[in-house]
């Protein structure tokens, strides 16, 4: 039987052909459900995480009030709009592990709005009484958060554009849309929707609140006060490794499962979500599908810290040095015994001592789980994905561990090696002289600083929005990172790495 195009009409045939290896949604969609969630930034991670939890609630528990309306704010989001529209907003989740592959057609995304085509439609959707939650996966750079001052980058041209009252009906940024939608709800006497960040940031909810309230105060203090008093911004820790979809993934889906999907998602079996129980206008029963909903924000912060420092920090330790050394995939880097030992020792000796104990969580078991996940060859997790937008990642995943280690006079030389590798990475040339693309919103500034500084880290460290002032004045840190930068420049990653392994 020839592969079938994914759409509502073909679902039953797809299920029959796939047998036990393919699951399809059997719940009602379209006008039969309410779209209680508006999600900004429908990419791979959202479609492997929040959308899957909502799919499970709709499939297993009959939830009908929290279907998702996806929103794309950027011009490049037209590709997602077109892919989803061509298949009735269905898509395939491909779960891969050593045990095999499984396909799950997800139906929780009920519609999609492309803001550049109709910005008013997005604002109206946020203001609709059915909308209870606006969720976000907009990456670190989408928050306009200054890592040094912890304030909104209010001078950014996009923020300035959205602060102009003349542009209120045609905002550019997430905060411009959130403000416009909430202002309309305020005027209509509706409760504010919960703003639920699903991005990899510690205190993601608190940061989102502060950024939006700061934006609103610059526009309308009365609306800002209402948001501060009535709004909800739960903190959350999210986790699921989700590589970029390749053409090979699409081909394998058609060959193995008989499904033709314009944009499937590949992911691992592991998934985790810990979220603070802080919602302003109701929420789905997340607990029924394995989400850890906690009352104590401190508990969320502890989970966040574990995940960001261990998983994301280790990803950075594989990504930037691995790219410089010529590797393509995470599992390839982990197959190298030097890298495997380096990452384990960094986790155990430099990061673990800085982490809080969480009742019921064994850090050593967690580290072992991470090693197992990183070595999964079936998901083909690309290093360029790990390395994307590093200016929003390194200040969260690596530098705080260095700063804390300095404070308690602990070891941090391996962490410095990772930072030094990133400083070389921003130049866009690997150890063999082969150029690669650096994708980062701060690329021009980073590369200018890297060229000016050479093997001296001081120029890059002068970017206060990323590094502040404290590290530049610490002699231990400057000595370690300068040594690492010089060694990498002279000998390359693979010859330098053994110096950082005991």
Curated annotation (Swiss-Prot):
It comes from the Eukaryota. It catalyses: D-mannitol + NAD(+) = D-fructose + NADH + H(+). Coiled coil: none annotated. InterPro entries: 6-PGluconate_DH-like_C_sf, 6PGD_dom2, Mannitol_DH, Mannitol_DH/Oxidoreductase, Mannitol_DH_C, Mannitol_DH_N, NAD(P)-bd_dom_sf. GO terms for molecular function: mannitol 2-dehydrogenase activity; mannitol dehydrogenase activity. NAD(+) binds at residues 37-48. The keyword Metal-binding does not apply. Catalyzes the NAD(H)-dependent interconversion of D-fructose and D-mannitol in the mannitol metabolic pathway. Monomer. Belongs to the mannitol dehydrogenase family. This is Mannitol 2-dehydrogenase. It comes from Neosartorya fischeri (strain ATCC 1020 / DSM 3700 / CBS 544.65 / FGSC A1164 / JCM 1740 / NRRL 181 / WB 181) (Aspergillus fischerianus).
């Amino acid at each position: 039987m020839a592969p079938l195009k994914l759409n509502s009409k073909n679902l039953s045939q797809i299920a029959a052909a796939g047998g036990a290896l393919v699951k399809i949604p059997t719940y009602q969609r379209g006008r039969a459900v309410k779209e209680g969630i508006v999600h900004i930034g429908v990419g791979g991670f959202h479609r492997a995480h929040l959308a899957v939890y909502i799919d499970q609630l709709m499939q297993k528990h009959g939830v009908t009030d929290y279907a998702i309306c996806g929103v794309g704010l950027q011009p490049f989001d037209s590709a997602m709009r077109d892919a989803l529209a061509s298949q009735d907003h269905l898509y395939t989740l491909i779960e891969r592990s050593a045990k095999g592959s499984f396909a799950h057609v997800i139906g929780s995304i009920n519609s999609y709005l492309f803001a550049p085509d109709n910005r008013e439609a997005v604002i109206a959707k946020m203001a609709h009484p059915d909308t209870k939650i606006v969720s976000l996966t907009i990456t670190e750079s989408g928050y306009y958060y200054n890592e040094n001052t912890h304030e909104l980058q209010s001078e950014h041209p996009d923020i300035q554009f959205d602060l102009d009252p003349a542009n209120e009906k045609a905002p550019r940024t997430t905060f411009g849309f959130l403000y416009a939608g909430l202002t309309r709800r305020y005027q209509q006497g509706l409760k504010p929707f919960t703003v639920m960040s699903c991005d990899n940031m510690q205190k993601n909810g608190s940061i989102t609140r502060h950024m939006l309230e700061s934006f609103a105060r610059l526009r309308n203090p009365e609306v800002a006060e209402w948001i501060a008093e009535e709004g909800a911004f739960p903190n959350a820790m999210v986790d699921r490794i989700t590589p970029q979809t390749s053409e090979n993934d699409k081909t394998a889906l058609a060959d193995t499962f008989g499904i033709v999907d314009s944009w499937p998602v590949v992911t691992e079996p592991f998934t985790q979500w810990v979220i603070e129980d802080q919602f302003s206008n109701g929420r789905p029963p997340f607990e029924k599908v394995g989400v850890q909903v906690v009352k104590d924000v401190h508990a969320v912060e502890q989970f966040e810290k574990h995940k960001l420092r261990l998983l994301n920090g280790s990803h950075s330790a594989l990504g930037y040095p691995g790219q410089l050394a010529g590797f393509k995939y995470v599992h390839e880097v982990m197959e190298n015994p030097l890298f495997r030992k380096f990452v384990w020792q960094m986790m155990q000796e430099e990061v673990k001592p800085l982490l809080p104990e969480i009742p019921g969580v064994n850090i050593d078991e967690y580290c072992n789980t991470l090693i197992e996940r990183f070595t999964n060859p079936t998901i083909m997790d690309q290093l360029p994905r790990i390395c994307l937008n590093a200016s929003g990642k390194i200040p969260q995943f690596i530098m705080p561990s260095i700063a804390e280690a300095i404070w308690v006079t602990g070891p941090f030389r391996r962490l410095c090696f990772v930072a030094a590798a990133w400083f070389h990475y921003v130049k866009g040339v690997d150890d063999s002289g082969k150029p690669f693309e650096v994708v980062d919103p701060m690329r021009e500034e980073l590369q200018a600083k890297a060229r000016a500084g050479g093997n001296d880290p001081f120029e890059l460290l002068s970017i206060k929005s990323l590094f502040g002032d404290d590290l530049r004045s610490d002699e231990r840190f400057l000595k370690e990172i300068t040594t690492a930068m010089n060694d990498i420049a002279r000998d390359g990653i693979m010859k330098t790495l053994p110096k950082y392994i005991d």
